[in-house]
Regions:
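Active-site and adjacent substrate-binding regions of carbohydrate-active enzymes
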Residues: 1-197
Length: 197
C-alpha cells in the first residue's frame, strides 16, 4: 500500500529526521522509481546481476541519469537472499572484484555478514547461500578469514571512499573506452569546492 508508506515515512521523518527507509524490493523499475518518489531514501538494486561491462555501463547510466532524482541505489554484492552464479564460481576473486565495483560505482554500498570469508556455497537450486542467517545463527571465524585479504580490502575501500568525495556521488560518473570487453574504465569527479584538497 503506497499511500500508507508515503504517510508513514513523512510522519516519522518529521519527528525523527535522521531515520531513513530502505526499500528492500526487487521489483519492476517503474515500481522502484515509485518507491523513491513516495519517500524511500534508499533502494536495493539489480547490481548483483550486472556482470558484463556493457551491463554495468548501461545500468549505471540509467541510475546516474534517468532515475537519480528519485532512486538512491545501494549496491550489495551479496545478501542473505542473493548469491549469484558469478559469486559462486568466482570465489575470493569475485568477492574482491564486486566489492571494489560496489564501493566505487555507487555512493552507498553494503556488505553482508561473512562477506570477508567469501562464503559461496549455494543452496541447491537457488541463488542464495546454503546456510544463511534467515534460518539459523551462524558463528564465523573472522580471524581465520584474514588470510584471504578481503577484510583489509574492505577497510581500504572505506578509507579511500572517505578520502575521495567523488565516490559519494552518483551523477558524475564517466565511462571510458577500452579495447577489451573484460576491462571497465570509469572516473568520477566533484567540483573543486567539494574536494578535500
Amino acid at each position: 500500500p503506497l499511500a500508507f508508506w508515503q504517510r508513514l515515512i513523512k510522519q516519522i521523518g518529521e519527528e525523527y529526521p535522521d531515520v531513513f527507509f530502505l526499500a528492500e524490493a526487487f521489483t519492476k523499475p517503474a515500481m522502484m522509481r515509485t518507491l523513491g518518489m513516495i519517500g524511500f531514501q534508499q533502494s536495493y538494486t539489480y547490481y548483483a546481476w550486472r556482470n558484463a561491462k556493457w551491463e554495468l555501463e548501461q545500468y549505471l547510466y540509467e541510475l546516474s541519469r534517468d532515475t537519480a532524482h528519485v532512486l538512491r541505489p545501494a549496491f550489495w554484492p551479496t545478501t542473505h537472499d542473493i548469491l549469484t552464479p558469478f559469486m559462486t564460481w568466482g570465489k575470493e576473486g569475485a568477492f574482491k572484484l564486486r566489492a571494489v565495483l560496489a564501493a566505487t560505482l555507487s555512493p552507498t554500498w553494503g556488505i553482508y555478514s561473512g562477506y570477508e570469508l567469501a562464503e559461496s556455497v549455494p543452496r541447491p537450486g537457488y541463488e542464495e547461500q546454503i546456510d544463511n542467517e534467515k534460518y539459523e545463527y551462524k558463528p564465523r571465524n573472522f580471524e581465520a578469514a584474514r588470510a584471504n585479504g578481503i577484510e583489509q580490502l574492505l577497510t581500504d575501500l572505506n578509507r579511500i571512499r572517505h578520502q575521495h568525495p567523488a565516490l559519494a556521488q552518483l551523477r558524475d560518473i564517466t565511462f571510458h573506452a577500452t579495447t577489451n570487453d573484460s576491462l571497465i574504465a570509469y572516473s568520477k569527479r566533484v567540483r573543486a569546492e567539494e574536494s578535500l584538497d
